[in-house]
Amino acid sequence: MDTFECLSCGPLASRDPYSPFCPGCGEPLFIASAACPGGRRIHEDKALAIAKFADFLPLEHIDPALSLGEGMTPLVPLGRVGRALGLAEIYGKNEAQNPTWSFKDRGTAVAVQKAVSLGTQRIGTVSTGNMAASTAAYGARAGLETFVLLKEGSSAASLQAAAIFGPRLVAVEGDYGALFEASLGIGKRLGITFMNSIDPYRMEGYKVTAFEIFLQLGRRAPRSVIVPLSSGGHLLGLMRGFADLEREGLIQTYPQIVGVQAEGCAPLAQAFDKGLAKYERIAPGRTIAHAIANPTPPAGNAVLRMMRERDGLLLAVSDEDMLEAQRELASSEGLFCQPESATTLAALKRLRDAGRLRAGEGSVVLILTGSGLKTLHLLASAPLEIHHFAIDGLEAGLARLSKRA
């Protein structure tokens, strides 16, 4: 049986299986680190990503039939971006290669494996987009009745991406934070396991990204990892992954973790700048980065604590900077990611300009969390440069356009 811990209160004797929060202080719960045995190793001969790292996950058995082939996403060298910034080792971890085109599949895969092992029949999630599609897909794969709650007014693309998998799809009026809280009580009364953003098993799944980066860099840790930040569960999962590697003696230097928010909704970056231990709820401003616009991040205080303990960094970038970074990643490196993902490159530029990153200091990994194909509507008003030629003038026209003509 798994044991749990709270960063503030310590180990718990028992836990409400329908709540991810500590009953004492209301902060998120984690799988207890002290309960993990030493001598864990990576099984590189295994095909499935979660099987490779099974020693580090709270799963007694992994059913391959529940997997959609998530994980082992490419770590792509960003040579042109690096040269433009005067930085040698820049990589993009392309999470768009996961089954539903985002990093969420890593957490969902582990959470669903656990749910099935416990005999769960009903699962659900509260989401603004990526997690809706992911939970619906894995619920369909496992044959579970799946409930997806989205905030009223969610984009048609978000609704359609989840609806194709056949879940009980519900649009709910009201505040997203209130919906998150309400889902937990409703789930307990109706027997629905809501595997929301800070579900402890979901966060365990996010550790696998850290393990993959370690292998893909030749069994070493990067100097820095830059990751978009919303609820905090993804970032904390990554941090726990590197902590596991450190605990097993597989890495000697813990990477600097940089969390990035949108300036229009940056409660954690603002709290970090002020040196606060707890974030202050804010009224969300306007931003195109809806997937990371969370004014009440449920793991926010845990993120602030871990940033202090691990010398991490939080910052916010503008919509203009993230859109410019999105275009640069696409045109320079062939990687089309969501604007939220491109916050990582925008943050990298900010750190370079401030002298916080210099050439020769080690590798930097940008976590590109999702595909730009999920947010095509944001490009609808972007100008298109299209050249028009008649067939008899095509060759001459192409010659004029060619950089090598």
PLM regions: where:
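PLP-dependent amino-acid enzyme catalytic core
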Residues: 1-405
